[in-house]
């Protein structure tokens, strides 16, 4: 970058100089972002799970929400069955199937599985609106959110909820997304599970580095959010298409903290 500053600008041609300065400004910005990225991830926190109270009667109630719109029932069933298998007191876990597609087959499946089914007559604000609509009926102390193609492991809640006892100002616990099938690039290049993908960088290092600075954020799925904190910010943010990051910013703005637990406690489709 020093060479660019000292040896590449044409000071005698105004047009070339203007174009060169604009390009140099962009390169300087990229260089600063790179340095900040290295600093941000230099000390990943590697936060361990926190222990729950010994008596399960003291554990909080959880609403686990699975939003869906046009996905096949065969995909959604796997997520529901995995949620039903969570190691958590049955009287403290309510599973919600949030069907923005309003499909009879989904309603029948939810009834057979013994879980709650919610459908909206309107579909404003997409996934965020779907979740906010269900929150009006939910009463749990915590809200766990899973995309309909994400499967929690049996220990998911026991691995995440303990941090809400350790940190009273904790607003959200996020976990990484691990994928059991290849994305299009990995499939076409035949690199699946032979080399890390961009998700491994983000969920394996960037988020863990963010956690060191209390800056990890909600990624839309595979997370647990404190209900009182969610109510305080008016529910899931609906003003942007990145409602997960926007929701995180609102939580942090009100003084809530976030946590990131780098453990394989669910798997996902790409």
Put a short name on every predicted segment.
Residues 91-101, 118:
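Short beta-strand/loop segment that forms part of the nucleotide-sugar
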Residues 99-106, 122-123:
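A conserved acidic beta->alpha catalytic loop
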Residues 1-58:
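N-terminal membrane-anchoring/stem segments of glycan-assembly enzymes
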């Amino acid at each position: 970058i020093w060479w660019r500053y000292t040896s590449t600008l044409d000071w005698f041609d105004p047009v070339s100089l203007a174009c060169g300065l604009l390009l140099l400004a962009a390169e300087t910005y990229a260089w600063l972002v790179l340095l900040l990225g290295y600093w941000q991830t230099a000390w990943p926190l590697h936060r361990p799970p926190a222990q729950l109270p010994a008596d399960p009667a003291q554990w909080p109630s959880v609403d686990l929400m699975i939003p869906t719109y046009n996905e096949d029932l065969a995909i959604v069933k796997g997520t529901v069955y995995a949620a039903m298998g969570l190691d958590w007191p049955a009287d403290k876990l309510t599973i919600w199937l949030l069907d923005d597609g309003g499909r009879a087959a989904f309603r029948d499946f939810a009834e057979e599985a013994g879980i709650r089914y919610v459908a909206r007559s309107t579909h404003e604000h997409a996934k965020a609106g779907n979740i906010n609509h269900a929150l009006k009926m939910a009463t749990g102390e915590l809200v766990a959110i899973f995309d309909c193609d994400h499967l929690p492991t049996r220990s998911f809640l026991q691995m995440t909820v303990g941090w809400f006892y350790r940190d009273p100002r904790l607003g959200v616990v996020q976990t990484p997304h691990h994928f059991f099938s290849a994305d299009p690039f990995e499939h076409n290049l035949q690199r699946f599970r032979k080399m890390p993908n961009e998700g491994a960088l983000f969920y394996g290092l960037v988020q863990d580095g963010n956690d060191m600075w209390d800056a990890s954020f909600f990624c839309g799925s595979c997370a647990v959010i404190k209900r009182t904190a969610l109510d305080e910010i008016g529910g899931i943010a609906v003003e942007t298409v990145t409602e997960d990051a926007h929701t995180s910013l609102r939580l942090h703005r009100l003084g809530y903290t976030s946590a990131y637990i780098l453990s394989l406690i669910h798997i996902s489709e790409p």
